[in-house]
Structure formats: structure tokens, C-alpha cells
């Protein structure tokens, strides 16, 4: 920890440490691979985790992993120098996913989905081959609530980015220690630390990404009610299945069985859902 940490640094240490404790993200002896993209979020994550590692008495390891996806203009010289100065173990691995994305995705379409899928596969494989049992990503509070809003508006489901995730193949635990941290605090901290930010030119060239629209919408709502972002984060931790419509989580069809006056006899349904089906129906 810095000898005289700034107020925002103290705030980051507090909320990151709280998230780690709340969700048991890091245990004694864990080998944590921090995905360092070169952006403000991942630089902040690595810096704060390194300070917490020292604070813990080195009860866990951290390793910085950077994937060079062969994007035009990529220059990691400053990144390498920064990592060397911090004495943080690291590797910068080059894999040309850029050419694949440009070939597969038509001009004008968003690259994010394919790009992230390719990147995720490489990250998982590297972690497994090198014995890292935790993979740390730099998503913050605002990423979580924007993803929630995007899922509702554009995908028609309720999901976000969990603070701790077991991968589908059951081989990896992914953690998001910055899940309580506000983006504005990361911006302030990144400026204080003068991180050698490497911009993502691939994504930055697409001005009409859905995420930017949703971020703008949330910002507008927060002007009228500053509690909107924190309320959205709280909503992710306060699901009430009985107040929603998902029959996988609440037995709406047989609620009558819970009545104090419920009869033990099986009652026949008046209608069958198949009677009202239409082809390609979507309410």
C-alpha cells in the first residue's frame, strides 16, 4: 500500500477488499491471473490487488497476463516498462485474433462478441496450462449495471456479470474484485497513477455500440436520482422470484395449493397453453 494513499485509493482498497471478502473470491494459496488489457480498469485492478496481496502477508500470488491481439498500432513498450518497474510477474502473449475478427464480421457490425469469445478461449487455456486457479477481470460496478440493462432491453432476459463464476467446463473460477467500484473512481485513480493506457482501437472506432447508449441512459436517470446506479446494483442482489414471471423459479400454476383452504383433490385446468399458440409468437 502507498505510504500516503489518496482518498480515492483508500476507497478502492475498501470496496475491492469488501467484494473479495463478501464473495470469498480469493483464498489462502490461490494463484491469481490478472488479465491486464492495458486499459484503466485492468491497471487499477492489478495495482489494488497487488497492494492487498502485500497487506495479506503474501497469502496469495498474482500474475499479470496480457494478450496482444495483433491490432494495428498496438505498442506495449510502456506496458512492459511499467510491469518491470513494479516487479510484477507477467507475460505478454501475441495471438492474431484481429485478422479473424475482421474477416468474419461484416463492416459496420460490432466486433465485441467474437473478439471476446476468442480472447476468453486463449485466457482459459493459458491459465490452465500455467496452473492459475483464479482469473481476475477488471469489470466494475457500472459494467455490471449496464450489462443488466442491455440484457433486459436487447436480449429479453435478466442477467449481468457475476462477481464469481465457475466456467461451463468446470475448470476455471473467474472473479471480478472491482464489482463494487464506481468507474469515476477508477478514472480518478488512473489519472493519479499515470497508467500507460493502451487504447482499444478496434472497439473505439464503433461509436454506436449498445453499451454506450445504455450508459448514457443510466447517466441521464442518475441526474434526476443519484441513487439509480446503486439501486440497480442492489437489485442484482435482491431477486424476488414471486414478483416476476419465470416459472422455472416460482410455481405459479399451482399457487392454489398454498391456500389455507386448499383442497387435496387435483383440479383440472380450464385452458391448455397449446390452445393459444401461434407460429413465431413473441409477446
Curated annotation (Swiss-Prot):
Protein name stated in the entry: tRNA-cytidine(32) 2-sulfurtransferase
GO biological process, one term: tRNA thio-modification
Lineage of source species: Bacteria, Pseudomonadati, Pseudomonadota, Gammaproteobacteria, Legionellales
Miscellaneous comment in the UniProt entry for this protein: The thiolation reaction likely consists of two steps: a first activation step by ATP to form an adenylated intermediate of the target base of tRNA, and a second nucleophilic substitution step of the sulfur (S) atom supplied by the hydrosulfide attached to the Fe-S cluster.
HAMAP family given in the database record: TtcA
Gene Ontology CC terms, in alphabetical order: cytoplasm
NCBIfam families registered for this protein in UniProt: PRK10696.1
Molecular-function GO terms, alphabetical: 4 iron, 4 sulfur cluster binding; ATP binding; magnesium ion binding; sulfurtransferase activity; tRNA binding
Pathway: tRNA modification
Reaction equations catalysed: cytidine(32) in tRNA + S-sulfanyl-L-cysteinyl-[cysteine desulfurase] + AH2 + ATP = 2-thiocytidine(32) in tRNA + L-cysteinyl-[cysteine desulfurase] + A + AMP + diphosphate + H(+)
Motif mapping: PP-loop motif: 37-42
Cofactor binding note from Swiss-Prot or TrEMBL: Binds 1 [4Fe-4S] cluster per subunit. The cluster is chelated by three Cys residues, the fourth Fe has a free coordination site that may bind a sulfur atom transferred from the persulfide of IscS.
Stored Gene3D superfamilies: HUPs
Keywords, ordered alphabetically: 4Fe-4S, ATP-binding, Cytoplasm, Iron, Iron-sulfur, Magnesium, Metal-binding, Nucleotide-binding, RNA-binding, Transferase, tRNA processing, tRNA-binding
Binding residue positions for [4Fe-4S] cluster: 112, 115, 203
InterPro entries, per database record: Rossmann-like_a/b/a_fold, TilS/TtcA_N, tRNA_Cyd_32_2_STrfase, tRNA_thiolation_TtcA_Ctu1
Cofactor(s) the record lists: Mg(2+); [4Fe-4S] cluster
Chief location: cytoplasm
Record keyword Metal-binding present: yes
Subcellular location: Cytoplasm
Superkingdom, natural source: Bacteria
Protein family per UniProt: Belongs to the TtcA family.
Keyword match Cell membrane: no
Amino acid at each position: 500500500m502507498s505510504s500516503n494513499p489518496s482518498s480515492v485509493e483508500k476507497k478502492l482498497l475498501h470496496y475491492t477488499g469488501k467484494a473479495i471478502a463478501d464473495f470469498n473470491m480469493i483464498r489462502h494459496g490461490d494463484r491469481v491471473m490478472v488479465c491486464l488489457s492495458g486499459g484503466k480498469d485492468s491497471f487499477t485492478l492489478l495495482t489494488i490487488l497487488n497492494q492487498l496481496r502485500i497487506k495479506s502477508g503474501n497469502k496469495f500470488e498474482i500474475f499479470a497476463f496480457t494478450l496482444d491481439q495483433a491490432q494495428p498500432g498496438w505498442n506495449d513498450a510502456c506496458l512492459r516498462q511499467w510491469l518491470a518497474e513494479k516487479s510484477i510477474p507477467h507475460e505478454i502473449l501475441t495471438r492474431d485474433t484481429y485478422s479473424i475478427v475482421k474477416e468474419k464480421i461484416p463492416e459496420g457490425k460490432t466486433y465485441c462478441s467474437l473478439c471476446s469469445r476468442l480472447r476468453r478461449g486463449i485466457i482459459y487455456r493459458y491459465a490452465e496450462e500455467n496452473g492459475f486457479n483464479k482469473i481476475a477481470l477488471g469489470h466494475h460496478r457500472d459494467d455490471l449495471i449496464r450489462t443488466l440493462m442491455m440484457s433486459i432491453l436487447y436480449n429479453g432476459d435478466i442477467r449481468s456479470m457475476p462477481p464469481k463464476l465457475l466456467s461451463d467446463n468446470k475448470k476455471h473460477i473467474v472473479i471480478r474484485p472491482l464489482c463494487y467500484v464506481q468507474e469515476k473512481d477508477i478514472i480518478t485513480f488512473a489519472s493519479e497513477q499515470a497508467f500507460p493506457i493502451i487504447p482499444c482501437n478496434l472497439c473505439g472506432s464503433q461509436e454506436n455500440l449498445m453499451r454506450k447508449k445504455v450508459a448514457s441512459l443510466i447517466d441521464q436517470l442518475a441526474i434526476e436520482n443519484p441513487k439509480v446506479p446503486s439501486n440497480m446494483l442492489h437489485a442484482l442482489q435482491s431477486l424476488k422470484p414471486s414478483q416476476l414471471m419465470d416459472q422455472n423459479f416460482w410455481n405459479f400454476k399451482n399457487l392454489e395449493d398454498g391456500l389455507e383452504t386448499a383442497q387435496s383433490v387435483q383440479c383440472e385446468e380450464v385452458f391448455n397453453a397449446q390452445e393459444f399458440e401461434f407460429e413465431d409468437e413473441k409477446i
